[in-house]
A protein has these predicted regions:
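An active-site-proximal structural segment forming one wall of the substrate-binding cleft
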Residues: 277-297, 350, 354-360, 364, ...
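Aromatic/acidic polysaccharide-binding cleft in carbohydrate-active enzymes
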Residues: 25, 376-379, 534-626, 630-648
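Active-site neighborhood of glycoside hydrolase catalytic domains
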Residues: 405, 409, 413-415, 425-436, ...
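Loop/turn elements at helix/coil->beta-strand transitions in domains of secreted/extracellular proteins
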Residues: 14-18, 295-299, 364-369, 432-435, ...
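C-terminal beta-sandwich/jelly-roll accessory domains of carbohydrate-active enzymes
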Residues: 667-751
Length: 751
């Protein structure tokens, strides 16, 4: 028999202990959280040339601008046009453009259709986000019968007349949605000597002066007149059947016709925040947001992750490229392309940018934790890290200024701050309440420490209470982290960090680990001896996927119950030490099936459904049952029944109901008989000696290899069904005898 006793309060529990870490990996943003189903929606796609990532020097990580990728043009032709394009090293190259794009940074497609072809109608199609590889030919627009979908596109008629029909069809070309239509007529002379290319030199004239007539043919369609001859068409369509399909835009013209196309959007009309005017740009997929919301995250870290650093100069995440109108956002290839099934087809559209991340934080009631580039490219093994010169004007002016401008964007007064005015004009005049910021991701070494100091000092000169998060590097081992931790503790000891920060710390240090379940269980006592000196811990990326232990990263071995148990054991240690462990977050958060660059993730999804993994269920059990006070826990065992595989934590509230959340993790293959002593945790804290105590017990248990699964089609399966029991004890001094199942996580809630 093992006796578990809940004792006196030890400290205030960190109010930010459980958060989420979002990075656009595994198509977590485009194809996932981004509600728009159109792949390369704006003809601005920039991709990794996957043949170059194994090369060396300047030939490595080359950029491939492919503005028409993921679009098929049948019986019509298309040209990519714009005033700039990405070069092979990511540089912006000026190009000739016969007519203005919607924004100077953007490109568009000029589409020409001749008289009707004998082979059939003219149309263009987009399959959506199917993950590529063997799945590259599959349609990915998820349609549900009788559901409403929003269609939006920007059109500029150039020549001739046509009717454009927009809708989703199945793999056989049969309608999956109703069709919406718009017509245009260009009342002008035929094309001159540019007819061979289909380009006009005077396309930039105002719509009202160009002899253009355009109108929706559907009662629910609407036309909005834009600049430079552009029109915005918005309409709704209705699902006819439930299936995956592809977007089709059919061109019905009795003569040669040319039009420009940009910003094509198709999404579920019931996106997250529908009807809220602040969600006027990027839109979010509701079921994914609701799955994240169910974790009750205290914070949201964004946008990563290694994409913060990028893999080569120019590939770093630049937050200023992600705000403003959608057309103004400068796309970038994702460094995670090399992990994709086809090795390259991963462009960051930035339809979800920093503004959308801040709005999501607000809706989730989670504090924002943006993390910015610190002047050092990704330092992971096998990469080619480049260091920006710390003495350069670019670093001292532009790089540091990015941090200061972001704080103004988030918190500033729109009347006096230009970046705060951008926030206001995007739909959010009120500040977002930013109180912490990450400086680099998984960076380490003397150069990083020097850059961290320069950045944090500039921040604290203006915003002394802003909490700066410092990286401990890639690996969770003391020798690797020593430089960062020594420096952080020195800053805290010399009063050189933040003053009166939100967590009370001078500085936070970000540790990461992707180790084995056994390692995580062994680290439940990791923080017991960490100094309480004003330098707090953020365990910012963790997953018991066995990567650091050299274990194969396979689909079969990912997200097993064994991995979730190891993580649960570790989290009991984080709760017990939440006076120094301020924040934790799992990574990666989201993964598209089959676009998984990492095998193990917290939440998986396909175009239609969500799969909360067993790891998610453990995370949710912990994050939704956390008190504001942590209590001492003792485990008394006999020699014949050792409890070395038992891990316990207890938090609660010192209110009238004296609520306690007691978490017990058994990672062994044997049941454990436990006596839970509640007297020290209840009667000793003022509960009436004669008042009954209500106990609610929830147990998650399964075979170590158990896991949930989801395919490209269909719903998830294999979910662990919680076992729930309720008891009433006659008084707070009573003991509860219970059997803790093997391979289990048990939550006892006492009131």
């Amino acid at each position: 028999m093992v006796r578990i006793s809940v004792g006196s309060p030890t400290h205030h529990t960190s109010g930010r202990l459980y958060g989420v870490f979002f990075e656009d990996i595994n198509h977590g943003a485009d194809g996932g959280l981004n509600a728009n189903m159109v792949n390369n929606y704006s003809f601005d796609g920039v991709y990794l040339d996957h043949h170059t990532w194994r090369m060396a020097g300047a030939e490595r990580w080359r950029t491939q601008a492919d503005s028409l990728r993921f679009w098929d043009f049948i019986n019509c032709s298309a040209a990519s046009l714009g005033s700039e394009i990405r070069g092979i090293h990511g540089q912006r190259v000026t190009t000739d453009c016969p007519a203005p794009p919607i924004h100077a940074h953007s490109r568009y497609a000029r589409i020409t259709s001749d008289v009707p072809s004998e082979t059939g109608p003219a149309y263009l199609e987009n399959l959506g986000y199917n993950g590529g590889g063997d799945n590259g030919g599959e349609p990915a627009f998820s349609i549900v019968a009788d559901h409403t979908y929003s269609v939006s596109l920007a059109v500029r008629p150039v020549h001739g007349r046509a009717e454009l029909s927009v809708g989703v069809v199945d793999r056989y070309g049969l309608p999956l949605t109703s069709i919406t239509r718009l017509s245009y007529i260009v009342d002008s002379d035929p094309l001159d000597d540019t007819e061979e290319t289909g380009l006009r030199q005077d396309d930039g004239a105002d719509a009202q002066d160009s002899g253009v007539s355009i109108s929706p043919d559907s009662s629910d369609g609407a036309i909005v007149i834009g600049r430079d001859g552009w029109y915005r068409f918005n309409a709704d369509v209705t699902g006819l059947n439930t299936d995956y399909g592809k977007l089709r835009i059919t061109i019905d013209a009795g003569e040669r016709t040319t039009f420009d196309l940009d910003l094509v959007q198709f999404m579920d009309a019931d996106y997250w925040g529908a009807g809220d005017p602040k969600w006027r740009y990027g839109k979010l997929r509701r079921d994914l947001v609701e799955t994240i919301q169910a974790l009750h995250p205290a914070f949201l870290r964004f946008p990563g992750g290694c994409i913060v650093e990028g893999v080569t100069p120019g590939n770093e995440y630049r937050w200023k490229d992600t705000v403003g109108s959608l057309a103004a956002r400068r796309q970038q290839y994702s460094m995670w392309s090399f992990k994709m099934p086809d090795g390259s087809s991963y462009s960051q559209s930035y339809q979800i940018g920093f503004y959308e991340y801040f709005c999501l934080c607000e809706d989730l009631k989670a504090k924002p934790l943006p993390t910015l580039f610190a002047g050092i490219a990704c330092q992971s093994p096998g990469r080619d890290p480049r260091h920006m010169d710390i003495n350069s004007a670019t670093f001292r002016s532009n790089m540091i200024q990015d941090y200061l401008d972001l704080i103004e964007f988030a918190n500033g007064d729109p009347e006096s701050s230009s970046w705060a005015a951008v926030r206001r004009d995007m739909g959010h005049p009120e500040p977002f309440g930013l109180d912490m910021i990450g400086v680099g991701n998984e960076n380490f070494g003397a150069d990083y420490v020097a850059k961290f100091d320069m950045i944090s000092e500039a921040i604290h000169e203006r915003y002394p209470d802003m909490l700066c998060v410092m990286s401990a590097g890639l690996f969770p081992f003391q020798p690797a982290m020593k430089r960062s931790w020594d420096h952080a503790r020195t800053l805290a000891a010399t009063d050189s960090g933040a003053h009166d920060s939100a967590t009370g710390d001078a500085i936070i240090v970000d540790e990461h680990s992707y180790h084995s379940p056994e390692w995580f269980a062994s680290q439940a006592s990791r923080f017991d001896a960490y100094p309480r000196c004003g330098a707090g811990v953020y365990f910012g990326e963790y997953s018991a996927n066995g990567y650091f232990a050299g274990q194969p990263q396979t689909e079969q071995g990912a997200n097993t119950w064994k991995s979730a148990l190891g993580e649960a054991a570790f989290l009991t240690g984080c709760e017990r030490n939440s006076d120094v462990v301020r924040m934790t977050s799992y990574a990666p958060l989201l993964a598209h099936i089959p676009a998984k660059g990492w095998a193990q993730n917290l939440i998986e999804f396909n175009p239609a459904h969500v799969n909360p993994t067993v790891n998610y269920e453990v995370e949710r059990l912990f994050s939704t049952h956390l008190g504001d006070t942590t209590y001492a826990v003792s485990i008394e065992q006999t020699a014949s029944r050792p409890a070395k595989h038992l891990y316990v934590s207890a938090t609660g509230h010192d209110r009238d109901d004296a609520c306690r959340y007691i978490k017990i993790v058994n990672i062994s293959d044997s049941p454990v008989d436990v006596t839970l002593e509640i007297a020290r945790g209840l009667a000793g804290l003022g509960a009436s000696p004669s008042r009954p105590v209500r106990l609610e017990v929830t147990t998650l248990s399964a075979n170590p290899t158990a896991k949930t699964t989801i395919g490209y089609r269909g719903e998830a399966s294999g979910a662990i069904v919680p076992e729930r029991r309720a008891y009433t004890l006659p008084s707070p001094s009573s003991l509860l005898a219970m059997k803790i199942k093997p391979y289990s996580v048990t939550l006892v809630v006492s009131r």
